[in-house]
Amino acid sequence: MQRESMEVDVVIVGAGPAGLATACRLLQMAQTAEKELSVCVLEKGSEVGAHILSGAVFETSALDELIPDWKEKGAPLNTRVTGDDVYYLPNKKSSFKFPNFLVPRPMHNHGNYIISLGNLCSWLAEQAMELGAEVFPGFAAAEILYAEDGKVKGVATGDMGVDAKGEQKASYEPGFEFHAKYTIFAEGCRGHLGK
């Protein structure tokens, strides 16, 4: 059974912060240049943000550049850091607070936000789609596709309806191919295609 395929300009594997920010920026640049650009983002999770480790302290300078009006657009950044402390824990029974002047500047989070990265990714996916991206949750890229000259030409999703022995069940459906001029791997630290 032959796989169905879709032709796009850019396919991005991974709908985390990096993949979605990339989709947004590429589409912003295309709009500025008055060029057509088809961007497709594949996410293995059943919904965007489902595979993101949740909590984070977020510094907004990158978001300020990417989407300057993020506050007006309802970005899920609601809880500002009002203070933070750093402790040394030499054993289970004692702790020592470092004086603030000894704490390295990058570890001071005053004015940053405490956020859910999953919620931020859901919101970034909305922004990317408003710009024209197609976002496909539940589409795990399983293999890299190569052209005859050895260049990457896209990715394919895994086949469905395959049993533990690798044999096709009655519900078998072949994976879907995404062919692209550019393939961007933003699958995170545990991504298997980038290995």
Predicted regions and their residues:
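Extended hydrophobic secondary-structure segments that form protein cores and membrane-embedded regions
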Residues: 10, 38-46, 180-185
